[in-house]
Amino acid sequence: VNVVILLSAPWLAAAVLTWQLPRLASRFHPDWQVPVVAWLAVTVAVSSWVSLVAGATVLWNQSEFAGRAAGSVLAVAAAAAVLLAVRHARNVRTSVRANRAFRGHSRDETGVLVLDDDRPDAFAVPGRSGGLVVLTTGLTDALTADERRAVIDHERAHLRHRHHVHVQAVELAARINPMLRPWCHVVRLAAERCADEYAARRDRRTAAQAVARAALLCARVVAPDVCHITGRPSDARVRVMALTGAPPERQRRRAVLAAGLVALVLSGQSYLAGDVIQDRLAPEAGESPATVIG
């Protein structure tokens, strides 16, 4: 019974956290939402994957055919999760290599590259030297000077806060645990909100206008690659409404501590589940192969 509770805990945690995720995310300042959602997703994914492997090793040691068959199913699920994660990682690597083509173009001293393209778009290309902000003439020609500056500040915020890393961490976590798929939208919206607030430091009204105009112009533009951060077009209304209101309050410590506690508990579960795997596959000297926690 203790083993069942131990191995099912991360899946129950994933279900509860996913159910309450929008409400929980709202308790964090935009600057905190992205890293908190990302690292919680990674922690849940690792914990749930380790529980799959532990469950497989426990069931494989059963004498009944049903137990061994169930163990095989869990093993296949764990292997499939790894394959999906590796496949996504390869897609990300391909996208990163494709983005290097932008770095070969000339740019101004501010790290902004304007492409002669009628399709309106703006995105950030990460790089070791601080990255690159790419705009198309289709977008810049439709914006005022202040709105262009707001869009550039927005994209720079993505680079500064390394949102691409956090977004892809959640994407990988969702490949390992499909219950985390809704987290991908949440982290992308959080990244946009964080960048919006950074751009709004000069003028919230101008930032709201830039977001609304850019969202309207770019609504039909297909994201260029898997690393694109932009959320759903429907998120633009939420972002504009947030920018037309007061700036977010300072982050409360209790929410951060609560998130840290959840991550700590799940990390402990991963350790204990790993101990179950070790007990079954390579029991210590003097320890019965059947020994399991509890």
Feature names for model-found ranges:
Residues L6-S26:
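N-terminal signal-anchor/start-transfer transmembrane helix
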Residues H29-T43:
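Loop-to-helix transition at the N-terminal end of transmembrane alpha-helices
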Residues N2-L7, W49:
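Alpha-helical transmembrane segments of integral membrane proteins, especially early/N-terminal helices
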Residues A41-A45, W49, A169:
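Hydrophobic alpha-helical transmembrane segments of multipass membrane transporters and ion channels
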